């Protein structure tokens, strides 16, 4: 990898700053707000795909034999390529309600908004779009969680709705390993999870539920590659498999 331009890795260094507020403005109501900033120096990233004489020399030095029919060999390696900064806000709240014989419900909400930025690039040749995108785009710009936890005697239930904001990832072309680059885009999506359980004894609980109850999938990948084996983008924050239903039992000692 040194022949292709790689250098010995240095440790990443980070500096975190946060400030928070906590309040209980009413009985059974709790609120919190946190602001944070995370700076990472010498962040380790992938170099992206490199080609040319340096790439060919690196492959040969590794002990591999290049097929003479191959005209465009590529290599990639890990490197301390960038400095980054993440700024965000976390807000949360919970409220408890008592409906008497009808049971109790604890309502909770959580919200996050964040922005990632590359503040310095030390990678020789700079960053291509496919190397920069995982750092600044591949996590949701915001996320909202609403949850209701129900308790009534031996019965319990939980309903959760999670809204993921826009998520994107720019990838290299599946045929060239570089340009033209393609940006896979996942629109804001709400995922609903539901579970109901019953305490058979003081130790045994039986439950049934669903993850991703509404069977939501991310937008299909633009560049699917490998004979369209990758239909959905793997960076989806809520997975690619759709709904999952289950029955389970748990025993505590």
Please give the residue ranges for each predicted region.
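Solvent-exposed loop/turn elements at secondary-structure boundaries
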Residues: 1-12, 17, 27-35, 39
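Residues that define the transmembrane beta-barrel architecture of outer-membrane proteins
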Residues: 3, 13-17, 85-89, 140-144, ...
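Extracellular loop and loop/strand-boundary signature of outer-membrane beta-barrel proteins
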Residues: 4-7, 75-80, 129-135, 177-184, ...
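Outer-membrane beta-barrel strand-turn architecture
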Residues: 13, 23-27, 39, 85, ...
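Residues on the lipid-exposed face of transmembrane beta-strands in outer-membrane beta-barrel proteins
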Residues: 19-23, 91-95, 109, 146-150, ...
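Gram-negative outer-membrane beta-barrel transporters
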Residues: 29-30, 35-173
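C-terminal beta-signal and adjacent terminal beta-strands/loops
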Residues: 115, 161-173, 198-253
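Generic long, charged, amphipathic alpha-helical segments
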Residues: 158-163, 170-191, 195
């Amino acid at each position: 990898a040194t022949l292709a331009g790689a250098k010995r890795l240095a440790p990443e260094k980070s500096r975190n700053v946060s400030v928070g507020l906590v309040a209980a403005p009413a009985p059974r109501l709790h609120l919190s707000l946190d602001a944070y900033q995370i700076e990472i120096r010498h962040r380790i990233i992938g170099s992206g795909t490199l080609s040319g004489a340096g790439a060919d020399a690196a492959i040969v030095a590794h002990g591999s034999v290049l097929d003479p029919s191959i005209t465009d060999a590529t290599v990639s390696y890990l490197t301390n390529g960038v400095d980054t900064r993440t700024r965000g806000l976390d807000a949360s709240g919970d409220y408890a309600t008592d409906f008497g014989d009808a049971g109790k419900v604890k309502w909770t909400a959580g919200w996050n908004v964040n922005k990632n930025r590359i503040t310095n690039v030390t990678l020789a040749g700079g960053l291509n779009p496919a190397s920069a995108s995982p750092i600044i785009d591949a996590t949701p710009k915001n996320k909202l969680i609403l949850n209701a936890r129900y308790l009534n005697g031996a019965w319990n239930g939980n309903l959760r709705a999670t809204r993921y904001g826009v998520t994107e990832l720019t990838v290299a072309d599946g045929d060239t390993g570089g340009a033209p680059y393609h940006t896979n885009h996942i629109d804001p999506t709400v995922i609903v999870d539901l579970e109901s359980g019953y305490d058979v004894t003081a130790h045994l609980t039986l439950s049934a539920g669903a993850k991703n109850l509404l069977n939501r999938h991310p937008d299909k990948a633009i560049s699917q590659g490998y004979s369209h084996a990758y239909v959905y983008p793997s960076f989806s924050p809520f997975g690619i498999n759709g709904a999952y239903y289950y029955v389970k039992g748990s025993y505590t000692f």
